[in-house]
Amino acid sequence: TMKRLPNVCDYLDLPMQHISQHILTDMNRTDTSAHIRKVCRMFKERGMMLRTTLMVGFPGETDEDFEELMDFVAETKFDRMGAFMFCPEDGTRAAEMPNQVPEEVKQERYDRLMTLQHGISLAQNKARVGTTCRVLVEKKRGSRYVGRSEYEAPETDGSIFFGSDEPCEIGSFVNVKITGAKAYDLMGERI
């Protein structure tokens, strides 16, 4: 249904935090690992761009839990992904849980997860080279403009940097052909 609505972007942010059922249960998340996988597959099959936010180092996260998370990210190939390391908050149940993950282990897991996503994001962005998209012009930086399409959320995702032979009005939409890709940003030319 969403795909057919012209005023709805083909972009979903599903902040799932983890995929291990053990960790989801310990987090008091009501969703199941199986349901999360099903939802992600369904939206990817429909051509939706998916973003998520994941956490590493929640108390009790084992090497197996983390590897399950890595495998899930590798198979799902999120278009956009953020991650953070668990940080205990005074007075919360999680801060008092046993099996706190050491900081150096959290950092190593975070680095591995973000390295994996960097490669996925670069491949996803390279696949957009040669395509044309509608871009909201947000600002001018030097001789180039900066904007985003329906697939880049403000403040969390990368930007599209593009040149134009004609001045572009900030706040307007222009068509841009994507000519280059980095892991998180795209380059292009107005057409």
Please provide the spans of the model-predicted regions:
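Conserved non-cysteine loop/helix-boundary elements of the Radical SAM core domain that shape
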Residues: 1-80, 88-105
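Terminal RNA-binding accessory module
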Residues: 85, 96-191
